[in-house]
């Protein structure tokens, strides 16, 4: 499809699962069951949520869950592992400020959210310093009124991405943002609302599953490396770590492979 593409490797990941299914059909486990989950909508954070909320999930609820993601910048086929948090939790958040429009010749007759918006733009990126662990707030979009020179703005919005390596720290950062926005709104006589999209739980690896992945990598003759710090990006696989022991690991896509989400990225077939 012109202008469309899998720029994170989901097509390759699903192909790997297909290949695994074929191998398992030829060499079935002596005991137990293996569930191959072809989950949609990973990029929006809604896919895992929909799976877990489906009543039919109880029929396949696993004792342990494993997932991989290709990682450009690492040697081809290298297994990248980490104990504890593997990838950050994150959420998209929008603050909506509502005042009152007026003629631009008489701004005093309205309530313009410009000052509150400006103060929030300055203050919010500093809030992660108040969280005990790693946290990050990235402003991504701001909007004030409309391009009408005769009108003093009556509404504004500010959108951002919040992320942290600990779920509790992420919730703390959300509360800090809400409190700051409410304080600015009250000071300037504005109504404030909050919206959330693309929310991802922290991907936390079970310590008991680490040696299993390590041993399999050794048996397959694959290089394995321990990552010192969690990745800052997020995966909705993190929700599975809240319902069963789980383990997310990376698979090197090549040191010269373009980074994920870049227009030139293409999943290396050698990983399949």
PLM feature segments, named:
Residues 2-5, 11-12, 30-141, 145-151, ...:
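Histidine/acidic-residue-rich, glycine-tolerant segments that coordinate divalent metal ions
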Residues 14-21:
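DPxDG-like acidic metal-binding loop motif
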Residues 23, 98-100, 253-256:
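Short connector loops/turns at beta-strand edges and beta->alpha or beta->beta junctions
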Residues 115-272:
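Metal-dependent amide/peptide-bond hydrolase catalytic core
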């Amino acid at each position: 499809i012109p202008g469309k593409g899998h720029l994170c490797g989901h097509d390759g990941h699903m192909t790997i699962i297909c290949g695994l299914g074929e191998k398992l059909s030829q060499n079935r486990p002596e005991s137990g069951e293996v569930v191959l989950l072809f989950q949609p909508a990973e990029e929006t954070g809604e896919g895992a949520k929909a799976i877990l909320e489906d009543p039919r999930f109880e029929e396949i609820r696993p004792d342990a869950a494993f997932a991989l993601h290709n990682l450009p910048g690492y040697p081809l086929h290298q297994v990248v592992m980490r104990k504890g948090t593997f990838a950050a939790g994150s959420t998209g958040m929008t603050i909506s400020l509502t005042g009152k429009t007026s003629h631009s010749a008489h701004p005093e007759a309205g309530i313009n959210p410009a000052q509150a918006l400006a103060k929030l733009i300055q203050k919010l990126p500093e809030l992660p310093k108040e969280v005990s662990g790693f946290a990050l707030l990235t402003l991504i979009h701001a909007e004030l009124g409309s391009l009408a020179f005769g009108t003093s703005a009556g509404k504004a919005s500010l959108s951002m991405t919040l992320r942290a390596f600990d779920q509790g720290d992420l919730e703390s950062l959300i509360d800090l943002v809400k409190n700051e926005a409410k304080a600015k709104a009250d000071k300037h006589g504005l109504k404030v609302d909050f919206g959330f999209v693309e929310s991802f739980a922290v991907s936390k690896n079970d310590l008991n599953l680490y040696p299993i992945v390590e041993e399999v990598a050794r048996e397959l003759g694959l290089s394995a490396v321990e990552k010192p710090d969690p990745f800052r990006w997020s995966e909705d696989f993190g929700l599975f770590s809240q319902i069963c022991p789980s383990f997310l690991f990376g698979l090197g896509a090549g040191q010269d492979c373009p980074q994920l989400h870049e227009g030139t990225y293409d999943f290396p077939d050698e990983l399949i």
